[in-house]
Amino acid sequence: MISLESQVLERHISFFDGKSVLFAGGISDSFPQTLASKCSSIQIWSCYFDYARTQSAVNFSVEFQGQADLIVYYWTKNKQEVNFQLIQLLAQASIGQEILIIGENRCGVRSVEKTLSPYGEIAKIDSARRCGLYHFSLQNKPHFELKNFWRTYQHSTLENLTIYSLPGVFSAAELDTGTELLLSTIDNKIKGKVLDLGCGAGVIGSMIKKRTPNAQITMTDIHAMALESARKTLSENQLQGEVYASDVFSDIEGKFDLIISNPPFHDGIDTAYRAVTELITQAKWHLNQGGELRIVANSFLPYPELLRQHFNDYQVLAQTGKFKVYSVKN
């Protein structure tokens, strides 16, 4: 089953004949692989590990160096990430580079004309499946340097910690209230091996390491920009920790004394519980005896029943009108 965006691209299959093609952005299916016989070569660049690990020949990275006759970009709702990736692609392309941009209308693809018009000619060439397809030709190359995209912030809750983040990372500009509530439950009694799952810019894991230097910190995420941000947050604050990609527990080895998370419940623009369901249902296999799973979540989300099913009982360590911090022991 291919996505709505790919279904629209199928209507314009002649664009791909005999060309080297680079697919990038929020691609989520195997459409590129189906074009292998039509194209001279295919490259895929994704910053999402949950996609990259399930497909062949995907470049999972923050930065990508590659040339192609045609670039196909899948628009996402994450506008900061879209801008970061498109500017990067345009900066390394040649004048006259041809790009197809496809996206669902509800994800804001209509704004592509405003985004790209300073750099060349853009025109809408199709509208179907609640998607828009645009054709772009590069005339004016932008400048791209990764260092220009870093953002930092501090917060009284974080003491003297400085958070570093790239575009598109959750809570990239300021400390979100859910994480702040979760941090309020952290004390200097935490010890042993700690997993910050879905680490984002590394706020939680870095704060634990700062308060309890003897804790062994591991941070994981599916987002390449988040992983790079977490690494920089650790290094710039002279903290030690391991950071790597994992789709929930897909690449996790060993067991932990604490698994802590502010788990995502938005997938694109839809609410999605898959990751959190896997986190709760599989956590006990990754916890030491007596180990703890601690998560913060919106109060309306149906996690208490799931926690009760797999851990018998749970505690609410802190709560506000909007969020609750849940704790269960293995």
Curated annotation (Swiss-Prot):
CDD domains: AdoMet_MTases (cd02440). This is Ribosomal RNA small subunit methyltransferase C. GO terms for molecular function: 16S rRNA (guanine(1207)-N(2))-methyltransferase activity; nucleic acid binding; rRNA (guanine-N2-)-methyltransferase activity. Gene3D superfamilies: Vaccinia Virus protein VP39 (3.40.50.150). It comes from Haemophilus influenzae (strain ATCC 51907 / DSM 11121 / KW20 / Rd). Monomer. The keyword rRNA processing applies. InterPro entries: DNA_methylase_N6_adenine_CS, Mtase_sm_N, rRNA_ssu_MeTfrase_C, RsmC/RlmG, SAM-dependent_MTases_sf, Small_mtfrase_dom. Its EC number is 2.1.1.172. GO terms for biological process: rRNA base methylation. Keywords: Cytoplasm, Methyltransferase, rRNA processing, S-adenosyl-L-methionine, Transferase.
